[in-house]
A protein has these predicted regions:
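Transmembrane helix-loop-helix
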Residues: 186-203, 313, 320-321
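Conserved N-terminal diphosphate/IPP-binding helix and adjacent helical/loop segment
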Residues: 2-167, 215-228, 355, 377-384
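C-terminal charged capping/lid subdomain of soluble metabolic enzymes
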Residues: 333-384
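Hydrophobic packing residues in well-ordered alpha-helices of helical domains and bundles
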Residues: 59, 63, 131-134, 198-201, ...
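Short, contiguous, pocket-lining structural segments
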Residues: 93, 173, 177, 193, ...
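Solvent-exposed loop and edge beta-strand segments that line ligand/cofactor-binding
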Residues: 34-41, 88-95, 169-174, 237, ...
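Acidic, Mg2+-coordinating active-site segments of isoprenoid diphosphate-utilizing enzymes
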Residues: 25-35, 104-120, 146-168, 186, ...
Length: 384
């Protein structure tokens, strides 16, 4: 059903890449009570739950008409249904975290010295209206790409995936609804009347497109290709998972007319927080699975990528072939093989590094509840 070359094994292992990759940031399965408390406390600081930040657009007449057609997909296996269901589980899965981070940073930074007194009077709960609009725009862009990621590659369609016409119809709805959300985001972006912010968010959209291209390009059998075409894992992860948040954080500082240093620190916080949480999400199958338990994991997950680099391409190919042909190595043994090498520990170390870098970046902001919430969020991605 999803675009994964090769055997049924590689399709099974890569389903999280094709079907759930858009949910990987701030929606991993580790949604513990600790993480939920961190998010809940942070939402109280910004004034309202960000789980419904894009609800205004989602409930518009135009998208309501699209939703009526999407209902026809009920009973099919098209991934757009799972995406739609995700909208009502936002408060549980923390899907709308980007907007929350933008609002927290805006509140933590406060008004700049360059801001006029008239502009300062427009602040609500320490946040400018334009910054709240930016947070909504950020969520709309993320949601649009999340919907687009659910488009099925019909070249890999099989009878077991259900009727072909259902997949074709679902793809049309995914393209239409994703484009609608993106168009609304771009309209809102223009209404901010700040060319630098438009440039920043536009470049983030370009980064997302490039990152998704890399994700689609990589060869499942080879892990991440031969290393000459694709960027290193960190660069690729930043494009598809971190650029939007990092540049939105920087744009929030620009809207409040903060200096370049404040913008740089906000960018760094968003960047390192994104990468830290991506690593945390990738690590979940390897730190939570019990001995002998078969857990679905992605071949593009950081521990697997690092494992492949450690053991070498030839041995990695051999391990995949043994699983594919049902030889001595089973799926659970492949998971154990990855866990036995230093790939997992390397990913854990890198996760801690990015968590610490995010904490360092936020220290320059004035001490406040908002800054404490940002510190708690950065620390939470370092817990497994």
């Amino acid at each position: 059903m999803f675009s994964a070359p090769g055997s049924s094994l590689t399709r099974w292992l890569s389903v999280s890449v094709r079907g759930l990759r858009g949910l990987s940031l701030f929606s991993s399965s580790e949604s513990s009570s600790n993480w939920s408390k961190v998010v809940s406390d942070a939402e109280k600081i910004v004034g309202y739950p960000t789980s419904f930040m894009s609800l205004r657009c989602l409930l518009s007449d135009e998208l309501s008409n699209v939703a009526m057609h999407v209902r026809k997909l009920v009973g099919t296996q098209h991934p757009l249904l799972n995406t739609a269901r995700g909208f009502v589980y936002d408060s549980k899965n923390n899907l709308q975290m980007r907007g929350l981070i933008v609002l927290l940073l805006s509140k933590a930074a406060g008004p700049s010295h360059a801001a006029s007194e008239l502009l300062t009077k427009d602040m609500v709960s320490g946040i400018y209206p334009s910054q709240r609009n930016l947070a909504e725009i950020t969520e709309l862009i993320h949601t649009a790409f999340l919907v687009h990621r659910g488009i099925v590659n019909l070249k890999d369609w099989t009878v077991s995936d259900g009727p072909l016409k259902d997949m074709q119809f679902g793809n049309k709805m995914a393209v239409l609804s994703g484009d609608f959300l993106l168009a609304n985001a771009c309209t809102g972006l223009a209404e901010l009347n700040d060319t630098k912010v438009v440039e920043l968010i536009s470049s983030a959209i370009a980064d997302l497109v490039q990152g998704i291209y890399y994700e689609n390009y990589y060869n499942v059998e080879d892990g991440l290709g031969d290393g000459t075409v694709l960027t290193p894992w960190e660069d690729q992860a930043f494009l598809s998972h971190g650029a939007l948040l990092a540049k939105s954080c920087q744009a929030a500082m620009q809207l409040a007319k903060h200096d370049r240093e404040a913008q740089r620190l906000a960018y760094l916080y968003g960047k390192h927080l994104s990468l830290g949480h991506k690593l945390n999400s990738d690590l979940q199958p390897f730190v939570k699975s019990r001995l002998g338990e078969v857990t679905s994991f992605s071949l593009s997950a950081a521990p697997v990528v690092f494992h492949r680099q450690i053991v070498g391409k030839e041995k990695w190919h051999q391990q995949l072939e043994e699983v594919k042909h049902g030889q001595s190595v089973t799926l659970s043994a492949l998971l154990a093989a990855v866990k036995s090498e230093k790939g997992v520990s390397s990913a854990v170390d890198l996760c801690r590094y990015h968590s610490n870098r995010a904490l360092e970046a936020i220290q320059a902001f004035p001490s406040s509840e908002a800054r404490s919430a940002l510190e708690n969020i950065a620390s939470a991605v370092n817990r497994f």
